[in-house]
Amino acid sequence: MDIYGLIGNPVEHSLSPPMHEAAYDARGIDARYVTFEPTKDTLETAINGANALDIAGINVTIPFKQDVLNHIIPDDIAREVGAVNTIKFHDGETPRGYNTDVAGVKRAFQHHNISIDGYDAVVVGAGGAGRAAAFALADAGAHVHIANRTVERAETIATDIGGQATAGGLDTRDEISDADILLNATSVGMDPDSNQTPVPQSYLHDGLVVLDAVYTPIETRLLREATAAGATTIDGAWMLLYQGVVAFEIWTEQDAPIQQMNAALRAELEDA
């Protein structure tokens, strides 16, 4: 039996185990997906222990996505983004690290047949999710503006991306009025504060594509108001699904059973 898992703190409410175990069942893989909660002080021990115990691969979540860079060999995307969320072990060798959050953003748009190349995109939030989203959109050809309460953090991302990326504060009326894509990469609107929204409804407009990284609730206030404004909406579960899809494909070198993974994920969200 192969063992995969998730390292983070906390991880007790993670939706990854049912999603990945549905994939193993669908592909006839004898595997389990388990969770681990190390501390920052025991992270290196946890990574080395997983490697020594022949664990096949692990996902990494908050607060360790940056810290694990010190213990693995990152691929080019993970190195550019400065964060790892997927690790693959290789027979005791130094583990390889990947950032599938970037691919998760791209494939969420692809799933909905939405082109990114040449579009103007606004990313709200300059944390880890915002950084991955901004890099994903820029890599796919979008002109990206990062908006954040602390402008310096947004400016850092824009500088790292280079090209035409720009940055500013949270007053994004002008940027969103000209934008084709809006992506919320903050936790604003997440349960139990689902009455909140990161962007005033008056900023939203027909022709805009709005992706909210928040997936509890599935339909956030931002998405409801975007629909009312005539925008196209994508819920955050699609990002979660596709980062898991890409992780599965890295680990197993098989095509992921996307339908079964999506069904398991959304069943868990309905029960949450």
From Swiss-Prot:
Q: Which InterPro entries match?
A: Aminoacid_DH-like_N_sf, NAD(P)-bd_dom_sf, SDH_C, Shikimate_DH, Shikimate_DH-bd_N, Shikimate_DH_fam, Shikm_DH/Glu-tRNA_Rdtase
Its domain of life? Archaea
The residues responsible for catalysis, as annotated, are K65 (proton acceptor)
Q: List the disulfide bonds.
A: none
Pathway participation: Metabolic intermediate biosynthesis; chorismate biosynthesis; chorismate from D-erythrose 4-phosphate and phosphoenolpyruvate: step 4/7
- List the Gene Ontology MF annotations in alphabetical order: NADP binding; shikimate 3-dehydrogenase (NADP+) activity
The residues listed in the UniProt record as binding NADP(+), with positions renumbered to this chain, are D76, G125, A126, G127, G128, A129, N148, R149, T150, V151, E152, R153, A213, G236
Gene3D superfamilies recorded for this chain? Answer: Leucine Dehydrogenase, chain A, domain 1, NAD(P)-binding Rossmann-like Domain
Catalysed reaction, written as an equation: shikimate + NADP(+) = 3-dehydroshikimate + NADPH + H(+)
UniProt KW keywords: Amino-acid biosynthesis, Aromatic amino acid biosynthesis, NADP, Oxidoreductase
Residues that coordinate or bind shikimate: S14, L15, S16, T61, N85, D101, Y215
Annotated GO biological processes are: amino acid biosynthetic process; aromatic amino acid family biosynthetic process; chorismate biosynthetic process; shikimate metabolic process
Question: What is the E.C. number?
Answer: 1.1.1.25
SUPFAM superfamilies recorded: Aminoacid dehydrogenase-like, N-terminal domain, NAD(P)-binding Rossmann-fold domains
Q: Which HAMAP family match?
A: Shikimate_DH_AroE (MF_00222)
State the protein's purpose. Answer: Involved in the biosynthesis of the chorismate, which leads to the biosynthesis of aromatic amino acids. Catalyzes the reversible NADPH linked reduction of 3-dehydroshikimate (DHSA) to yield shikimate (SA).
Assembly and interaction partners: Homodimer.
> What protein am I looking at?
Shikimate dehydrogenase (NADP(+))
Q: Which organism is it from?
A: Haloquadratum walsbyi (strain DSM 16790 / HBSQ001)
